[in-house]
Amino acid sequence: ELALGRGGDQVVIKNNEKISFFGGNTRELEKRTRVRARVIAQALRELIFESSNILIMGHKNPDMDAFGASVGLWSAIRQLGKSCNIIIDNDINAIDYYMNKLKSDSKYDNLLISSSEAEKAINDKTLLIIVDVHNKGYVSNLNIAEKINRKIIIDHHRRSPDIIEGALLNYIEVYASSTSEMVTELIQYMLQKPRISKIEAEGLLGGIFMDTKGFQFKSGV
């Protein structure tokens, strides 16, 4: 399962607690199908409707892919009529410019909350969506990730042995260029008529641009 989650072109050997990987060095080519994205989107949509509130969290020191994907999901969830917030604790240089654009629009006044505010909002029906990370050591706030029972992981990095446990959905797609690309695809299946604003689209595009190194890496169709 771990080998398949990392792309399938490798062997995994576990010796006691030590895990070694052999292979997995081939160039990652497009192997995804839209069927899986459609199924995941439908499952995600149902979980959102079953939730009292939704929190979104990325990795430590979030970059444009993590934050752009978060904003895209936030927009889709709000269009489904549910309460949603993105957990951000500190000002991050990598996303300062985009963050300031969001802050200049009153639509996004309640977009962000701190970890301490998020902990107060947690209840049995809270759903946590973890984006652009699945490793316990890199998630923004492991305490929150472990405290919330209902959680989903959306990520494009090769699967780590130290994965956050207990997720209702693990959507880890190593052939995607970025988490922002994955979220963009999910949105079109989550909503009948998506209404993504210019600034939200810029965030998703910025995430894809960053992780493809200016559309030079993993940008084939």
Q: Predicted regions span which residues?
A:
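Catalytic/regulatory signature loops of cyclic-dinucleotide turnover enzymes
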Residues: 2-20
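Active-site cofactor/cluster-binding pocket
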Residues: 112-166
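Residues in the short beta-alpha loop(s) of Rossmann-like NAD(P)-binding domains
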Residues: 17, 90-92, 157
